[in-house]
Amino acid sequence: MGGAMSIYLGVNIDHIATLRQARKTRYPSPVEAALAAETAGADSITLHLREDRRHIQDADVTILRQTLKTKMNLEMAVTEEMLGIALETRPSDVCLVPEKREELTTEGGLDVAGQQAKMRDACARLGDAGIRVSLFIDADFAQLDAAHAAGAPVVEIHTGHYADAASDAARAAEFERIRRAVAYGRSLGLTVNAGHGLTYHNVQPIAALPGIHELNIGHAIVAQALFVGWKEAVAEMKRLMVAAAG
């Protein structure tokens, strides 16, 4: 992409919607949060329309598609319903994620290698509509090869195992896996993003990795916003990332 920026921040607004849905109120508004995040330095807005609609609702997607000034990164499962919504809404980016993510925390990313035809079909349909497709995968060479073969121009490396590591040694091992995966993905010509579980305390090593394009971060920013305010929480994360990326 070039430009002066060395790394980009995608702010995930799912948990603004979680807070709203807890009481089925009209506030806090994910749309308002997204627009404020943009003014605070977010380079894109990420939202996950789940099949159970537990946080983001269809109306949020529709309104945000019309109002965002940056780009929308719509996370979704690889189902006919979701593909239909994406093709109708036409966000700039779609990130395909595991169907039941909460039950797959140990596995993390999509098994692209195990469902190559399905992934190739989804990538082709979205790509033909002018949507840039990203696949959310583990830091695994076989999955990177499969993502490349499926025709996805972008991958998002799952950083959850790194974030959740119980010891320094385990974290160092996970970090090395991610580092190698980023380098390998770049060698295949893929744009490599990363996300899941990133916080103000663990983001900088990932942001400093050569070849990382964008980090998608949500929960940590929403939590920090309780204490410092939403715009400051977004700006603070962006500052940490840019400082690390040099």
Swiss-Prot record:
Its EC number is 2.6.99.2. It is found in: Cytoplasm. Gene3D superfamilies: Aldolase class I. It comes from the Bacteria. One of its GO terms (cellular component) is cytosol. Pathway: Cofactor biosynthesis; pyridoxine 5'-phosphate biosynthesis; pyridoxine 5'-phosphate from D-erythrose 4-phosphate: step 5/5. Catalyzes the complicated ring closure reaction between the two acyclic compounds 1-deoxy-D-xylulose-5-phosphate (DXP) and 3-amino-2-oxopropyl phosphate (1-amino-acetone-3-phosphate or AAP) to form pyridoxine 5'-phosphate (PNP) and inorganic phosphate. HAMAP family: PdxJ. This is Pyridoxine 5'-phosphate synthase. It comes from Thiobacillus denitrificans (strain ATCC 25259 / T1). The lineage of its organism: Bacteria, Pseudomonadati, Pseudomonadota, Betaproteobacteria, Nitrosomonadales. The gene is pdxJ.
